[in-house]
């Protein structure tokens, strides 16, 4: 619940769809997967409190969290216990690496993700701006003090320098800000070809609306946080904006999931990429649990937890609905991004890039 419920609810629903289907087909080695559900409200303290309560109730693995900052707080706790943890949507490098600023930093070997990471998104969108949009100049608009936003911004700027994409203006805002007129006026005056805004959907909608009012006609570009932005600005203002996603709607690999999700939750469309990513993340975690069960280990023991972790780590091309899963040395999946364009008020899949 809370400000980011449009991420959290699809994550919950996508994961539960997979687990309910798994249980309906016999579960894992004849055992049903029991889920203890907690609402962290997008807050790190709430997430850790929920984790401690869950441990008291005898959990064997953790699915979550949804937001980057919340997941890092949770990962600090699960790391101490070597508790298997899979997140569908937390993209910062600091989720699996203890200190991203230190090249020699240890990783959290127990933590995995189904989504791609912040630097990967930022680099991909810089490449896309140059290769696909023929951009020569760019402005950047990001949220200070936000791991996700700053991570994408830094990666985009570094890649832009490498590609010769000139950054003509950089603007920022703080959490809770809603009036972006001043920043968008500055960006409009800089007249960039593209504006990279690695922010979440609600703020993205406000920023794009303010930019158009200020006379800025640049193409807005975002990361996966843009998902659902169509609900937060007019179709006219959003037209031509693009973002990268971990989900390619309508493609063969996700059609059955889309049908099942719509039927299960009585909705007309998949809300955003977080539902299918959560479906895959639940699959990854359950495949790990299956490996531990097949070894006859006792749930909750150190050996059991390590077997779950090892099984996920050693996946090599395990098929999910958003792509195949193998993991690099930092427990990040190796997979392409989907490019989504805002067209006629809809978020339309363009290509894998």
Set out the residue ranges of the language-model regions.
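Extracytosolic ligand-binding ectodomains
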Residues: 1-353
């Amino acid at each position: 619940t809370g400000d980011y419920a449009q991420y959290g609810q699809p994550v919950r629903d996508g994961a539960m769809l997979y687990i309910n289907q798994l249980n309906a087909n016999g579960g894992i080695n004849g055992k049903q997967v029991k889920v203890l559900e907690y609402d962290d409200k997008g807050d790190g303290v709430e997430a850790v409190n929920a984790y401690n309560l869950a441990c008291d109730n005898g959990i064997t693995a953790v699915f979550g969290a949804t937001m980057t900052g919340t997941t890092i707080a949770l990962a600090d706790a699960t790391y101490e216990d070597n508790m298997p943890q899979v997140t569908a949507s937390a993209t910062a490098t600091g989720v699996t690496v203890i200190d991203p600023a230190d090249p020699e930093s240890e990783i959290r070997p127990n933590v995995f993700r189904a989504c791609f990471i912040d630097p990967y998104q930022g680099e991909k969108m810089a490449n896309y701006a140059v290769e696909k949009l023929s951009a020569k100049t760019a402005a950047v608009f990001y949220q200070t003090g936000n791991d996700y936003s700053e991570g994408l911004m830094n990666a985009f700027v570094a890649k832009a320098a490498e590609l010769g994409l000139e950054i003509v203006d950089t603007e920022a805002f703080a959490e809770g800000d809603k009036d972006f007129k001043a920043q968008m006026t500055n960006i409009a005056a800089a007249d960039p070809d593209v504006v990279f805004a690695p922010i979440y959907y609600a703020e993205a909608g406000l920023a794009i609306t303010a930019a158009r009012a200020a006379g800025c006609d640049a193409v807005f570009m975002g990361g996966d946080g843009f998902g659902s932005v169509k609900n937060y600005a007019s179709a006219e203002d959003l037209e031509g904006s693009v973002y990268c996603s971990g989900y390619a709607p309508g493609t063969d690999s996700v059609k059955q999931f889309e049908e099942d999700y719509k039927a299960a939750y009585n909705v007309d469309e998949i809300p955003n990429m977080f539902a299918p990513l959560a479906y895959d993340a639940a699959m990854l975690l359950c495949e790990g649990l299956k490996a531990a069960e097949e070894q006859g280990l006792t749930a909750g023991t150190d050996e059991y937890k390590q077997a779950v972790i090892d099984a996920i780590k050693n996946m090599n091309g395990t098929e999910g609905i958003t792509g195949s899963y193998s993991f690099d040395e930092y427990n990040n999946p190796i997979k392409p991004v989907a490019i989504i364009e805002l067209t006629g008020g809809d978020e339309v899949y363009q290509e894998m890039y």
